Amino acid sequence: MATYKVQIPASFKTSYSFAESLKVSIAISAFSVKVPCEGAANCNSVRLVNSKEPEKYVSDANAIVSFLYWKQEEDLFNSFISSKLSILDWEALQFTPKAYTAKTKEDFAYLLSQLETIFKENEILNEFTPVEVALASDIYFCVLNGAPVREYPLLSAWYLKIEKQKPFVQALKLTFEKTLGQPAVTSTEKIPVSETTRNVNSQHLMRERVPGEKILPKSNERNILITSALPYVNNVPHLGNIVGSTLSADVFARYHRARNHNTLYICGTDEYGTATETKALEEGVSPKELCDKYHALHKEVYDWFEIDFDHFGRTTTPKQTGIAQHIFTKLYNNDYMAIDTMTQLYCEVHQGYLADRYVEGTCPKCGYDDARGDQCDGCGGLLNAFELIDPKCKLDRATPVKRETKHVFLSLDKLQPAVESWAMQSAVEGKWSNNGRSITESWLKEGLRPRCITRDLKWGTPVPLEEFKGKVLYVWFDATIGYISITANYTDEWEKWWRNPEQVKLYQFMGKDNVPFHTVIFPSSLLGTGEKWTMLHHINTTDYLNYETGKFSKSRGVGVFGNTAQDIGLSPSVWRYYLLSSRPETSDTMFTWKEFITRHNSELLANLGNFVNRTLKFTTAKYNGLVPHYLTDPSVGAGKLKADFVKDVNALLAKYNAALEASKLREGLRLAMEISARGNQYLQDNRIDNKCYLYERQKCADAIGYALNLIYLLAAIFYPYMPSTSTSIYKQLNAPAAAIPDTWELCLLPGHRIGEPEYLFTRIDESMEEEWRSKYGGNGSN
């Protein structure tokens, strides 16, 4: 029979599909017919296929068995036809439909009683004809599903003999191997899933990044350059730092990657400055050793939070020196620099000039007694260190003295007309966040003044002027140039990103305290060179995320920091979800353990987790893990339910895309959860349960088919927010990562095999609130 082959589908051995495959395997073994047999995960039932014309096949197991019997000896087949054909008819028309839906003990008792009657009224042989083949596989199916076969003496006695015969033993082994890819030893085998078992519309997939290939702007595509504020190297980021810049930018970058936009996300540690010098002195190491240590710590934190930079660099590089000095020299030659003598605070104890942030005292504006010399955390106002009441050196608490020193100033007053014209246009075109606009307008309205951009330090980018040898560039002139140099360390073709305003849009994410440096000082520096640069298109800022009753404080042990969040034992997705749903987009927000637990249990678990798990388990139980044959036209079947469902999802999806395009990340997450909730409602509206499956087959298939496709969409739209959760959903669906579409498409097609259902989330016990609050200083002591 070289022109034929048998294909056996993947299935659980407790399924009736497995029993049907076993029929054919017994026939191959018992009738000594040489026909090739192969596993075929892309089919739903056992098939006899014409090898030369594979589109032609028979998928009825009894018909295949009868054909193989006829091929063995035509005379025997004719004799069989006349005497036992009615038993096969009964088996196909009566037994099989009930076997497919059997679930309860009563269901199997009915099947066994019918089989016992067959044995009473007919001569059943101890050898194989098509009838014995069918009965053997039927009884095997009942045994594997826990049916009380021993209570039926005739069929149980016969089965005990037949299951030991060589054809049955060989057939069982063959079916296991072809069905599962390996011999099975328990009743809980998992159906193998792979790309060969997929039936997915491949026109809507997310474009994969090629490992090792540098991302460069492309013509005729959206080229999106994203940065997040460079974290200062010797600070361990707390949750507020993370959501304020790196996590927010990561969501935006992942969204645009999932839209198949050409996207580059750059960040790195800001490593120069007084703070590094002083911290290194405290720890007894060199500044470079300190930076190496903390750069690795930052990278570890961001990796755990699944923040996916295209490149995470640092500012202490030769390229930083070269680019920063180039910009400085251009500004100097263009007469946008001025030299002046200024008075600085000097600590006579450790013999060094003090950067503003290393002078502490009482704020003259609000009376906050822990203000820094550059800014007050109490009122948010910018300060001059000399304005502080009772100033102290942060390092040794000595009272600093005043000393004169010569420095270079950036003439922001000369640059104001250019930067003001640019800012007003960019704020409108780029739809800046409210904080970005208001803070910038406030600075410009007050009038820009020359700002000192050099410091008396050793650790920094050297000032490229001979008379200033021994001085370095001030970190807030130097640090923002780090975005450019970090890109230059990523690719030698960095100018295609940073000198290409016609093709590239620059999006920058940060906390509100960093706004002036990105909307005034950095743009002024670029404009003053007279060269073509990619300028800020959109700035996105956050207010402050506070902790319980106050502020995060590493020194006081208050709050969760990046290197301690993982100790709690929850997945990064749980943290990302809460932080982004509480993102301080328009005002300060508060992290509380009570809300953290409540949102996890009532939103992640009860909404998204429930919908995904319920649908996938139903598909596995009722459809053997295959996407059922649903009607793809939403106007056909199920009245208005399906059409309204599609309409609602598309309306929410449009709002989701609009929110993400505007970098309204919290609103986008809320809409994603609303789409998931609409999926739960759709299942409830269709009353998906065993009764629906048994008596409204097409309605049930439609509902499950659409629900599975909605889960595929949810995996895509949650990818920016909870990438590992989306990866788990893709794995459970056995589907490749999907692009985020403009409108919802049905991409999981009938016959596609899903993977093994798993829980996305598990409940957090409410009692953990007090334990975590106590451990992380949330009792109001701060």
UniProtKB/Swiss-Prot annotation:
Instruction: Look up the record and give one Gene Ontology term from the biological process aspect.
Output: cytoplasmic translation
Where does the motif 'KMSKS' region lie? 551-555
GO CC aspect terms: aminoacyl-tRNA synthetase multienzyme complex; cytoplasmic stress granule; cytosol; methionyl glutamyl tRNA synthetase complex
Q: Which InterPro entries match?
A: aa-tRNA-synth_I_CS (IPR001412), Anticodon_Met (IPR041872), Met-tRNA_ligase_1 (IPR023458), Met-tRNA_synth (IPR014758), Methionyl/Leucyl_tRNA_Synth (IPR015413), MetRS_core (IPR033911), MetRS_Zn (IPR029038), Rossmann-like_a/b/a_fold (IPR014729)
User: Where does the record say this protein resides?
Assistant: Cytoplasm
Its EC number(s):
6.1.1.10
A GO MF annotation of the entry reads: ATP binding
User: Catalysed reaction(s)?
Assistant: tRNA(Met) + L-methionine + ATP = L-methionyl-tRNA(Met) + AMP + diphosphate
Q: Which UniProt keywords apply?
A: Aminoacyl-tRNA synthetase, ATP-binding, Cytoplasm, Ligase, Nucleotide-binding, Protein biosynthesis
Q: What is its main location?
A: cytoplasm
Residues of the signal peptide: none
Q: Where, by residue number, is the motif 'HIGH' region?
A: 231-241
Is Electron transport a UniProt keyword of this protein? no
What family classification does the UniProt entry report for this protein?
Answer: Belongs to the class-I aminoacyl-tRNA synthetase family.
Which NCBIfam families does the entry mention? metG
Q: Which HAMAP family match?
A: Met_tRNA_synth_type1
Report the protein name in the record.
Answer: Probable methionine--tRNA ligase, cytoplasmic
Query: Gene encoding this polypeptide?
Result: rar1
